[in-house]
Amino acid sequence: FNLLVKLNQRNPEVQNYHFDTIRFWVDEFDIDGIRLDAADVLDFDFMRGLRRVANEVKPEFWLMGEVIHGDYSRWANPEMLHSVTNYELHKGLWSGHNDHNYFEIAHTMRRLQGLCHDTRLYNFSDNHDVERLPNKLRNRDHIRHIALLVYTLWGIPSIYYGSEFGIEGKKEWGSDWPLRPCLELTDYTDAEKTNPVTSIYAALGSLKAECPELSWGEFKELTLTTQSYAYARVLDGKAIVAVYNNGDSPVSMEFQLPVEASGVEDLL
């Protein structure tokens, strides 16, 4: 990151300047959190200091960092950041569908749970730095599969503006600007009724708000093949089960429900 300003993050004056900045924004504007760009080059003790100040000024204040590679628990833990960008899952979401290989997504979830435990990572399908899903998927119908995964896997779902409309965005000549277009919302007034991508995002947003299982429920894998995947989010004797088929024809799946039940309900 040669273009970034180099600050001595161990200098007390530098630290206090940033600590006071958090205090100012909370006192003046009651902000709820900040995103730390390129958090993987920040000093760990500096981030510990940020967390201490955040806890002091507003217990629910949220610190999220941009981290691409590595063991995410080094940055996201009870002493430093609350969460980091989940690029590892992001890669599996689109390539796992292109390759018809749900093992990639399942393996990623197992690995991240082993490393990060209860920490909820910042899950996304696309953002301002990566090409949008319609330009990466071989089958654009899989956009809806990925939306469901982002909302129901363990973590915090993040929707990049325009993704709820399924817009395209491909890097050109090394520039990210095609990923960041200006949208006129008046062009999408009826999108929830006419656009299947928008309708699934709207339904998932409502489901997330109504069902605490999707925020706090234990994640349990139920069955897995290259083309089919099922898991549950379980909380207080209730379970939400998500079932996927990335193939071109129907499949049959058998698995044990994670809770006792007399029936099931289709939530979407």
What feature does the model see in each segment?
Residues 10-28, 142-147:
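Short, acidic/polar
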Residues 214-238:
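Surface beta-strand/loop "capping" patches
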Residues 33-39, 133-134:
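Short catalytic-loop micro-motif centered on adjacent basic/acidic residues
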Residues 1-9, 178-181:
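Aromatic- and acidic-residue-enriched carbohydrate-binding clefts of CAZyme catalytic domains
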Residues 33-35, 62-65, 122-124, 151-152, ...:
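Structural recognition of the beta-strand scaffold that forms the well-ordered cores
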